């Protein structure tokens, strides 16, 4: 919301700088998104008196001698039609910044710096300026809309600051307001807060007016939907004289982004911005039946609004009708059939409180919004409805544009505009704050906020102003508003008074990572060194993910916690596995053209002890790794698993496993010292097809709650071997069903000198018989007591081959 400092000063004597006021607003809970001067791009502009003005032959230019007061007299060349000797105009000195305009002299194209120049042989030491070049409009300053030089007041002194004269030195606060403070959606609302912050009296806008004896006989107002319109006020104004608004009103409206239309319409917009009350004015000559009725629209009923758009309504929409037809879409926009025109002679002013939810739904459903609907959506109180009407009628008299009749109707089924009493415990207020604010200080602060407090022992009695609907007690026995009172106290007292303290139940611990955190970080570093990128997903997944991975009905993964109010259906379950998120992530990467890669995630899965929940679920820290692409395989995933094992100085073993979403022959469970910690395998082909995945994908999940037992395992130093290692590469032909792990286990059991076994090739087809495969291993033998010669190593190989043949029927490939 835009708030001009000059307008704010109308109600509060502000004796601090704009920057200091910005700080006070921030400390009081109001975020100032931007603070800027109206003429922030304009600099070094002073009043100049043209002493002589001579035409330059054969051009439209004039060469002028300009008196700029303390800045001296300078020669300036000017092409404006209205330049003349004796005239006073804005002078941009050398080095000044002004707006550059297009050829139409109206369109701003940027900011330019004035330099010394030469035109038709005449030197020019500055520039005489138009209103557009200063960023001014006709609404901001009278005469600025003229397509020529901006004329300064006759009493303006040469050398005087033009920004001060034209109001370009005014400051603007762009304030972001929270939803719980609709009372601050106006200049007066912010002024109330500034008054309390600076402890200065609030000067209320004038609301006095005189009613004549003239009446609109028989006029009546009925509200058929009081749930949607708890208050509706109408007041008749006659002998209306349509015309322009005074310059001060047009300027203020322009500063907050509203263009002047006419005096009557401008008054409604002015009250909206000043008081926060949306107003509307109907041309009485177009109201039929001498009545106004507030009702729900009929099904299919139509209205053409002020922007000449036709809308078809339903009973969900609230309309303002005369005796025959709808004349306004309540809270959103008036009807074209009753708009204020140049010929308007009498008007009916409307000030109302409409239900915020209904206005919001109507605006969304019809795709129609306005300044008024935005204000109603945030909430309007009955106090502002009454004050807004009084202020509008005062302005009618002040501007001399009409006479106020004694005909007015006020239908009220809502709250009283009188302050409502509320009592809270001072002890409870201080307990919320965690500090001891003296009772007399609380009284002082709440008095500044216009709550008229009194104290009796521990009981603080407040008179809640009607415009503070966020603080109004919800019943006679409402004693639970002390947190709201605490908020009011501390934002005025100062948040800096709250000291950092530990909660009573908090435990003080030494800094640094614990064992689990250190182990987790080491694990992540290990995966990164193997080319994997960390990713993070929501802690939720979709029921369709469980179906995608084909989990049986009784699978533990389907025993998931349902979110009561999910973001959407795809994030409606707490994750019981990380695999679904990882497989979907691989699919998304492929769709973005990333056809290979390695990803990992460390996150919690949530295993409920029972459903519906009666106690907290078991949260288990889990690692999920995903690989995909032409270079990835079951064995590269096994290499990643072995890399994790090596980093922990443990050995993983693998056994075949069946998983609903993994390839039946390329899936294993992972064991660490005989304890199952997870699984890995190739994603099943049918799942890859459903996700349109082009390359093979592999996924691994490890339970870090179990694996963390080995995070701080002490590593023992193994001395370097005294004798040279011996390596042999052997290829074996075997049944397809035999696993790599079975071969490795058999070799290690047969020979105690085997240090390392690496699988480096798998081959099928060609000379390999049907149902068979070839697996090639590199086997490393390490002597312990003496060096091995070739003959002894060959004996090892022969025994290994014999044992493999005996156990599995394996043959050494020629």
Language-model segments: which ranges?
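Extended, well-folded interaction surfaces typified by the phenylalanyl-tRNA synthetase beta subunit core
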Residues: 189, 422-595, 728, 780-782, ...
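Glycine/proline-enriched, intrinsically flexible loops and inter-domain linkers
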Residues: 5, 55-57, 198, 202-301, ...
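Conserved mixed alpha/beta core segments that line enzyme active sites in large multi-domain catalysts
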Residues: 33, 47-76, 255, 262, ...
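Mobile "lid/hinge" segments at catalytic clefts and subdomain interfaces of large enzymes
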Residues: 120-129, 133-135, 144-148, 163, ...
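Phosphate-backbone binding interfaces of nucleic-acid-interacting proteins
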Residues: 1-211, 348, 367, 371, ...
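A carboxyl-terminal module marker
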Residues: 2, 447-455, 461, 470, ...
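Beta-rich nucleic-acid/ligand-interaction surfaces
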Residues: 39-43, 209-213, 463, 507-508, ...
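Terminal amphipathic helices with adjacent charged low-complexity linkers/tails
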Residues: 198-223, 400-429, 436, 485
């Amino acid at each position: 919301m835009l708030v001009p400092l000059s307008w704010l000063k109308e109600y509060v004597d502000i004796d601090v700088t704009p920057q200091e006021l910005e700080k006070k607003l921030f400390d009081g809970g109001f975020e100032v998104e931007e603070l800027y001067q109206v003429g922030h791009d304009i600099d070094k502009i002073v009043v100049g008196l043209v002493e002589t003005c001579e035409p330059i032959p054969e051009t439209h230019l004039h060469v002028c001698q300009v008196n700029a007061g303390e800045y001296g007299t300078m020669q300036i060349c000017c092409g404006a039609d209205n330049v003349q000797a004796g005239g006073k105009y804005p002078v941009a000195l050398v080095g000044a910044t002004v707006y550059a305009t297009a050829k139409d002299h109206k369109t701003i194209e940027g900011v330019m710096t004035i330099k010394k120049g030469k035109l038709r042989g005449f030197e020019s030491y500055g520039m005489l300026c138009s209103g557009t070049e200063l960023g001014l409009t006709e609404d901001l300053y009278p005469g600025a809309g003229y397509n020529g030089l901006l004329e300064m007041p006759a009493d303006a002194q040469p050398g005087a600051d033009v920004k001060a004269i034209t109001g370009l030195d005014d400051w603007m606060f762009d304030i972001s307001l929270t939803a719980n403070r609709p009372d601050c959606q106006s200049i007066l609302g912010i002024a109330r807060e500034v008054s309390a912050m600076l402890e200065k009296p609030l000067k209320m806008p004038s609301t006095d007016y005189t009613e004549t004896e003239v009446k609109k006989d028989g006029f009546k107002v009925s509200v058929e939907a009081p749930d949607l319109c708890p208050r509706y006020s109408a007041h008749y104004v006659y002998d209306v004289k349509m015309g322009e608004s005074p310059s001060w009103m047009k300027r203020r409206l322009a500063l907050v982004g509203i263009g002047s239309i006419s005096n009557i319409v401008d008054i409604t917009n002015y009250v909206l911005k000043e008081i926060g009350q949306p107003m509307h004015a109907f041309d009485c000559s177009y109201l039929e039946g001498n009545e106004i009725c507030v009702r729900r629209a009929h099904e299919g009923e139509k209205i053409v609004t002020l922007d000449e758009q036709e809308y078809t309504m339903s009973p969900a929409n609230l309309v303002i009708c005369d005796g025959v037809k709808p004349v306004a879409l309540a809270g959103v926009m008036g009807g074209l059939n009753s708009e204020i025109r140049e010929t308007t002679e009498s008007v009916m002013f409307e000030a109302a409180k409409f239900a915020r939810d209904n206005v919001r739904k109507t605006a969304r459903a019809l795709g129609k919004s306005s300044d008024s609907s935005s204000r109603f959506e945030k909430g309007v109180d009955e106090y502002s409805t009454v004050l807004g009407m009084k202020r509008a009628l005062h302005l009618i008299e002040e501007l001399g544009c009409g006479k106020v009749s004694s005909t007015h109707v006020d239908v009220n089924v809502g709250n009283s505009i009188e302050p409502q009493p509320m009592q809270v415990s001072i002890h409870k207020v201080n307990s919320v704050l965690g500090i001891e604010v003296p009772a007399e200080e609380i009284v002082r602060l709440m008095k500044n906020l216009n709550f008229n407090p009194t104290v009796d022992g521990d009981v603080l009695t407040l008179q809640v102003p009607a415009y503070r609907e966020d603080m109004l007690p919800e019943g006679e026995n409402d004693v639970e508003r002390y947190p709201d009172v605490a908020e009011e106290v501390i934002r005025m007292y100062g948040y800096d008074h709250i000291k950092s303290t530990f909660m009573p139940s908090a435990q003080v611990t030494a800094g640094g990572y614990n064992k689990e955190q250190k182990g987790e970080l080491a694990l992540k570093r290990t995966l990164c060194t193997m080319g994997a990128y960390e990713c993070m997903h929501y802690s939720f997944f979709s029921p369709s993910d469980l179906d995608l991975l084909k989990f049986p009905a009784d699978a533990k993964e389907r025993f998931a916690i349902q979110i009561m109010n999910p973001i959407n259906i795809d994030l409606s379950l707490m994750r019981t596995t990380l695999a679904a998120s990882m497989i979907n992530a691989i699919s998304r990467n492929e769709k973005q053209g990333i056809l290979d890669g390695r990803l990992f995630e460390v996150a919690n899965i949530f295993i409920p002890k029972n459903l519906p929940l009666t106690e907290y679920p078991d949260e288990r820290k889990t690692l999920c790794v995903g690989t995909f692409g032409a270079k990835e395989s079951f064995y590269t995933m096994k290499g990643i698993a072995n890399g994790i094992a090596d980093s922990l100085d443990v050995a993983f073993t693998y056994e075949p496993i069946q998983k609903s979403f993994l390839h039946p022959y390329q899936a294993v469970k992972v064991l660490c010292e005989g304890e199952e910690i997870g699984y890995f395998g190739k994603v099943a082909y049918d799942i890859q097809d459903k996700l349109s995945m082009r390359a093979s994908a592999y996924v691994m999940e490890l339970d870090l709650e179990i694996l963390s037992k080995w995070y701080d395992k002490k590593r023992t130093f193994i001395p370097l071997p005294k004798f040279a290692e011996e390596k042999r590469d052997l290829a074996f032909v075997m049944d397809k069903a035999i696993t790599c792990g079975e071969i490795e286990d058999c070799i290690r059991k047969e020979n105690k000198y085997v240090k390392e076994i690496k699988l480096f090739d798998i081959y099928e087809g060609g000379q390999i018989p049907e149902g068979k495969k070839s697996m090639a291993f590199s086997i490393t033998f390490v002597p312990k007591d003496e060096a091995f010669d070739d003959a002894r190593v060959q004996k090892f190989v022969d025994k290994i081959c014999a044992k493999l043949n005996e156990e599995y029927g394996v043959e050494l490939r020629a």
